[in-house]
């Protein structure tokens, strides 16, 4: 599970930051999932090492322009390139109307299947490896956060030990790898769990934007390996945050702390905190770390490899930039 930030600015792009989009690359499935698709997202993908041909799912949090204005352009380009098999899009009520209207008035025809799923709180997608759930956030319009949970899997199978026990290879190995108990032809009963290493705990990612501090975000982020949370405002601008129903750095950090996450990655920063201003982005990072030390500030094209629990969890962010 590798996260790439394609846009980390709120509202409008800046010279250094595009508007909201986050890519989740799943190498084991050769799939690419997007979370939000602000204007210019396809340009950001082209500037990265991501493969648009692997795009299979897009999750939209809400229908504000800085989160959806890049959607139609990306979908249309995928059709012209002819290298996308199918795209499933998940989002709030009204998303399908937006796509249908835009395609009708622009005479855009897609050469591949697109399925729009109107989401409600709960499980919205599941396969043999992942479960995706969504929950309501607290914003000016209906907004959803998303949680991607990788399923636990059996530990590494000890083939050498199986050979020592003279267990015949083949279908039985598959059963033992899954931790099943198998009776051999000679009558021996083999417990697969005894031939496997420790269970590999599935990784969890939560994506919460746009929102003010709310229980819904805490619930989605519970015990996550990484929480991506908006931090539009500095703490001293909390009055504006309450008026516009956006989060401050301290709200993002409090969410991470309450949810017991392992890493907080802040995004969706107001352009008002540009270098040279009274408050700069580095100040926002210090505010959050005062509450939740394991915080980093995302920047465009930053990648983060979500570590497995058996690996070190504090050394997976590429070099920082604010």
UniProtKB/Swiss-Prot annotation:
InterPro entries, A to Z: Metallo-B-lactamas, RibonucZ/Hydroxyglut_hydro, RNase_Z/BN
CDD domains (UniProt xref): RNaseZ_ZiPD-like_MBL-fold (cd07717)
UniProt-annotated binding residues for Zn(2+) 2: 66-67, 210, 268
Pfam family, one: Lactamase_B_2
Cofactor(s) this protein cannot do without: Zn(2+)
Enzyme class label: hydrolase
Keyword hit for Protease: no
Gene Ontology MF terms in the entry: 3'-tRNA processing endoribonuclease activity; zinc ion binding
Key words, A-Z: Endonuclease, Hydrolase, Metal-binding, Nuclease, tRNA processing, Zinc
Annotated active site: 66 (proton acceptor)
List of residues binding Zn(2+) 1: 62, 64, 139, 210
Annotated cofactor note: Binds 2 Zn(2+) ions.
Known EC number: 3.1.26.11
UniProt superkingdom: Bacteria
Reactions mediated catalytically: Endonucleolytic cleavage of RNA, removing extra 3' nucleotides from tRNA precursor, generating 3' termini of tRNAs. A 3'-hydroxy group is left at the tRNA terminus and a 5'-phosphoryl group is left at the trailer molecule
NCBIfam families for this protein: PRK00055.1-3 (NF000801), RNase_Z (TIGR02651)
Record family assignment: Belongs to the RNase Z family.
Self-association state and partner proteins as the record states: Homodimer.
Summary of the function given for this chain in its UniProt record: Zinc phosphodiesterase, which displays some tRNA 3'-processing endonuclease activity. Probably involved in tRNA maturation, by removing a 3'-trailer from precursor tRNA.
Name of the protein this chain belongs to: Ribonuclease Z
Organism: Nostoc sp. (strain PCC 7120 / SAG 25.82 / UTEX 2576)
Gene: rnz
């Amino acid at each position: 599970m590798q996260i790439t930030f394609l846009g980390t600015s709120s509202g409008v792009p800046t010279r250094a930051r595009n508007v909201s989009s986050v890519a989740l690359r799943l190498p084991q499935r050769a799939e690419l999932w997007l979370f939000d698709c602000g204007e210019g997202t396809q340009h950001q993908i082209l500037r990265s090492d991501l493969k648009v041909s692997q795009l299979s799912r897009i999750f939209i949090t809400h229908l504000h322009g800085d989160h959806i204005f890049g959607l139609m352009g990306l979908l249309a380009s995928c059709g012209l390139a002819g290298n996308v098999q199918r795209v499933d899009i998940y989002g709030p009520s009204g998303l399908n109307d937006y796509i249908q209207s835009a395609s009708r008035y622009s005479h855009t025809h897609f050469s591949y299947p697109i399925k729009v799923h109107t989401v409600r709180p709960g499980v919205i997608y599941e396969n043999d490896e992942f479960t995706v759930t969504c929950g309501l956030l607290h914003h000016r319009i209906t907004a959803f956060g998303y949680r991607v949970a990788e399923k636990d899997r059996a530990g590494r199978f000890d083939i050498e030990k199986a050979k020592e026990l003279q267990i015949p290879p083949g279908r039985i190995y598959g059963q033992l790898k899954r931790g099943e108990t198998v009776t051999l032809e000679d009558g021996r009963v083999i417990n697969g769990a005894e031939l496997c290493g420790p269970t590999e705990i599935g990784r969890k990612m939560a994506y919460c934007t746009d929102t003010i501090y709310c229980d819904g975000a805490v619930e989605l982020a519970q015990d996550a390996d990484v929480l991506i949370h908006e931090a539009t405002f500095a703490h001293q601008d909390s009055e504006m945050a309450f008026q516009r129903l956006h989060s401050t750095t301290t709200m993002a950090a409090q969410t991470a702390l309450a949810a017991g996450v392992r890493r907080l990655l802040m995004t969706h920063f107001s352009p008002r905190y540009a270098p040279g201003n009274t408050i700069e982005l580095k100040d926002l990072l210090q505010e959050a770390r005062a509450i939740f030390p394991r915080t980093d500030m995302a920047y465009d094209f930053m990648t983060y490899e979500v570590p497995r629990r058996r690996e070190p969890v504090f050394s997976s962010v590429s070099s920082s930039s604010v």
